[in-house]
């Protein structure tokens, strides 16, 4: 016999969220897995002798939320605490809409912002990785790497690129960014154009990229896992994370991600002297302030300014 959680409990509220359209309509399986992982972890947390899952929702106030964040930060990391609170905000917002809670204490907690990720690919790593993908018989991943870098786009928008997005007469790729809904128009670059012949038009679908082992379009999970396998095979190194340290004070490291190609491309465009308007048109950012996180590796804007002044 299934034992249902007390209807007043946090566990019951999480069940309500998981039954909601907000949760069931999440497209990416990896996003759902991430949310489930954070919720599974936090529901088991004990503070003041009581498990979070068994607490009444009415007992979870601003003071408790602060204690919960500090507990997760101390037990795991700031990163984990921040991401857990992102999910708990969604759960409590659904509770507000369903009339099961009166306020969202997790929205009130001012969580510290972590340093922006500044991981970059080198040009040699890009060229080497593309060559390795081709040699291993996976040109689809090679072309996605080139397109992520040269188009300065997120992997999801490259992975789901269709032949119909590319205007055969003008050579311009027209698509809508999935995260922002922004309409993009980017002329196909020479390097991408030179690789399109490596990919076949299929009757089954219109996607440019298919996983060679199945002949079917990449899912988000397949793309991420297979990129990691190829990256490890090629030997992409782990790199230090700017301004982030482990509990013992040692430097925190990270693998290089496919998503880091977007930052690399935008930074390269900035170093090449592109204006804010040009960078916004290329990246899809809505305002120049959002570009600041991409201007990494050496005060690019100030250097460009002094070059234009003739001081460098």
State each model region's role.
Residues 1-8, 24, 187, 233, ...:
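Basic/aromatic DNA-contact patch characteristic of tyrosine site-specific recombinases
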Residues 6, 19-93, 98-100, 136-137, ...:
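N-terminal core-binding DNA-recognition domain of tyrosine site-specific recombinases/integrases
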Residues 50, 131-141, 186, 202-205, ...:
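Short, basic (Lys/Arg/His-rich) helix/loop patches that form interaction surfaces
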Residues 78, 82-84, 97, 101-102, ...:
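Basic, Lys/Arg- and aromatic-enriched nucleic-acid-binding interface segment
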Residues 120, 177-181, 276, 283-308:
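Catalytic-site neighborhood detector that most strongly recognizes the C-terminal catalytic loop/helix
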Residues 165-172, 252-255, 272-293:
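Short, polar N-cap/turn motifs at the start of nucleic acid-interacting alpha helices
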Residues 178-197, 205-230, 257:
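C-terminal catalytic core of Y-nucleophile DNA break-rejoin enzymes
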Residues 212-215, 308-312:
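C-terminal secondary-structure termini that scaffold catalytic or DNA-interacting sites
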């Amino acid at each position: 016999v299934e034992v249902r959680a007390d209807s007043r409990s946090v566990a019951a509220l999480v069940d309500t969220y998981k039954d909601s359209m907000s949760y069931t309509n999440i497209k990416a399986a990896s996003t759902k897995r991430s949310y489930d992982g954070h919720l599974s972890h936090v529901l088991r947390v004990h503070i003041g002798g009581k498990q979070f899952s068994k607490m009444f929702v009415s007992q979870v106030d601003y003071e408790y939320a602060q204690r919960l964040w500090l507990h997760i930060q101390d037990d795991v990391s700031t990163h984990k605490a921040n991401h857990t609170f992102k999910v708990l905000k969604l759960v409590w917002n659904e509770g507000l809409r369903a009339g099961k809670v009166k306020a969202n204490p997790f929205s009130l907690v001012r969580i510290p912002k972590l340093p922006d990720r500044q991981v970059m690919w080198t040009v040699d790593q890009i060229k080497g990785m593309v060559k390795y993908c081709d040699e291993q018989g996976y040109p689809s991943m090679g072309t996605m790497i080139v397109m992520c870098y040269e188009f300065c786009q997120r992997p999801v928008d490259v992975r789901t690129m269709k032949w119909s997005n590319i205007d055969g007469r003008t050579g311009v790729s027209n698509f809508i960014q999935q995260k922002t809904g922004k309409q993009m128009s980017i002329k196909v670059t020479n390097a991408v154009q030179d690789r399109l012949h490596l990919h076949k038009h299929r009757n089954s679908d219109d996607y440019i990229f298919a996983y060679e082992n199945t002949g079917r379009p990449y899912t988000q999970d397949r793309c991420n896992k297979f990129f990691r396998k190829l990256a490890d095979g090629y030997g992409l190194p782990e790199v230090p994370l700017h301004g982030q340290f482990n509990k013992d004070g040692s430097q925190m490291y990270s693998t290089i991600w496919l998503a880091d190609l977007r930052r690399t491309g935008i930074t390269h465009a900035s170093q090449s002297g592109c204006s804010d308007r040009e960078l916004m048109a290329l990246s899809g950012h809505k305002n120049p302030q959002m570009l600041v996180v991409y201007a990494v590796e050496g005060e690019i804007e100030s250097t460009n300014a002094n070059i234009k002044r003739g001081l460098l």
